[in-house]
Amino acid sequence: MSSKLRLGVAGPVGSGKTALVEAICRRLRDQLQLAVVTNDIYTQEDAEFLTRVGALEPERIRGVETGGCPHTAIREDCSINRAAVEDLERNFPDLDVVLVESGGDNLAASFSPELVDLCIYVIDVAAGDKIPRKGGPGITRSDLLVINKIDLADHVGADLEVMKRDATRMRGERPWCFTNLHSGDGLESVLQFLLQQLPNRPE
């Protein structure tokens, strides 16, 4: 039996993907059956971190070492990730959500529809307020765009109003939100998005 929802979490290195996965797990683990697959190029660092901080029980977390280009492992040849997801689904047949965190990649990264049902794409304010208008599949076509680290805007000279305008223009009707995952600001918007996807999922 497959999980009700396979949710990809992608974005550049350091944008806050692992922080988002941890926050989702901590907030929803008491009401949903969750599991996580992380991707790193040469290590299992993110999986080890999530285990160390107790985001979920260790047996619900899988680390995938992609080698080479992390984009390939979630798009062109996602077999290693699909195997990890299917293994979790066999071990936990009542899973509601499997979160698949990509390795850090560029704005062109996107998940194969064979691997995930929906994708959250995470960027951060520290990369500059021009990022939303640069476009790319993550910016324009992800199911939810998360603009993280809003607390750093003043420190890096980023204008949140510019980012708001550009994100709205680039995404049209697709949702997006600001977050500061360190403090939890904006997390409710992400959780609400995730929960809204579940009731209509096929069993």
Curated annotation (Swiss-Prot):
It is found in: Cytoplasm. Keywords: Chaperone, Cytoplasm, GTP-binding, Nickel insertion, Nucleotide-binding. GO terms for cellular component: cytoplasm. GO terms for biological process: urea catabolic process. GO terms for molecular function: GTP binding; GTPase activity; nickel cation binding. CDD domains: UreG. Pfam families: cobW. Gene3D superfamilies: P-loop containing nucleotide triphosphate hydrolases. GTP binds at G11, P12, V13, G14, S15, G16, K17, T18. It comes from the Bacteria. InterPro entries: CobW/HypB/UreG_nucleotide-bd (IPR003495), P-loop_NTPase (IPR027417), UreG (IPR004400). Its main location: cytoplasm. Belongs to the SIMIBI class G3E GTPase family. UreG subfamily. Facilitates the functional incorporation of the urease nickel metallocenter. This process requires GTP hydrolysis, probably effectuated by UreG. Homodimer. UreD, UreF and UreG form a complex that acts as a GTP-hydrolysis-dependent molecular chaperone, activating the urease apoprotein by helping to assemble the nickel containing metallocenter of UreC. The UreE protein probably delivers the nickel. This is Urease accessory protein UreG. It comes from Prochlorococcus marinus (strain MIT 9303). The gene is ureG.
